[in-house]
């Protein structure tokens, strides 16, 4: 298996090196949806998310990867950022653990599924081990240096009723502005202003008769 593992590492490094050189800094969310109901219980949970971690690892919750366990935010956390994180690959540390094992610093959790042979006309199936990312929600106290992490929300405080107050002005790293409600609002407002300005300028041109007639 060591040969296949080395091949995997080579391919991952090759892809990351090429993509990073072509577009450095390309990481963040292209989609993010928070469970607003759990905020009232003092917990943070992700319903769906898609994007790239800073180390180039793609994630897709819940289609390809399980959503991280909800984080019961510590009441002492104030003006702190909660991150979506994955342990960094380190020499001498297991990359993969079996389902049910302690995750530790593993980057993949293996589970067995029945796979169909797409090239056979027969209903031929076989058990296939599939690895998913054991993503988790952490804060700075959990050690960001050992993780590829991107900020999800900034928690202002945990109120006396245990609900979470989030900083609405916080914008996480993004690949698509549609993943952020504030940025989407700014974009739509700007497009609306540009449209109004364009209509006003067009009206002035027509009113002044400054139109050119082109003939072949």
Feature names for model-found ranges:
Residues 214-215:
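Conserved small/polar residues in nucleotide/adenosyl-binding loops
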Residues 67-203:
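Internal, hydrophobic cores of structured domains that mediate oligomerization or house catalytic pockets
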Residues 1-45:
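N-terminal "first-domain core" detector
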Residues 37, 54, 64, 87:
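Acidic/polar N-terminal loop/beta-strand segments that form early-domain functional surfaces
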């Amino acid at each position: 298996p060591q040969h296949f593992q080395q091949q995997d590492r080579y391919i991952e490094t090759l892809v990351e090196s090429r993509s990073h050189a072509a577009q450095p800094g390309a990481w963040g969310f292209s989609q993010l949806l928070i469970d607003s109901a759990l905020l009232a219980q003092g917990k943070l949970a992700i319903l769906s998310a898609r994007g790239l971690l800073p180390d180039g690892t793609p994630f897709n919750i819940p289609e390809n990867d399980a959503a991280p366990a909800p984080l019961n935010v510590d009441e002492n956390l104030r003006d702190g950022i909660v991150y979506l994180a994955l342990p960094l690959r380190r020499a001498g540390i297991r990359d993969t653990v079996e389902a049910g094992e302690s995750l530790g610093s593993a980057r993949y959790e293996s589970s067995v599924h029945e796979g169909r042979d797409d090239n056979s006309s027969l209903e031929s199936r076989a058990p296939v081990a599939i690895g998913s990312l054991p993503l988790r929600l952490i804060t700075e106290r959990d050690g960001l240096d050992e993780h590829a992490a991107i900020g999800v929300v900034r928690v202002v405080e945990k109120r006396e009723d245990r609900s979470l107050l989030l900083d609405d002005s916080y914008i996480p790293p993004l690949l698509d502005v549609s993943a952020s409600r504030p940025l989407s609002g700014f974009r739509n407002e700007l497009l609306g202003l540009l449209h109004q300005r364009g209509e006003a300028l067009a009206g002035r041109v027509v009113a002044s008769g400054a139109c050119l007639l082109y003939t072949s």
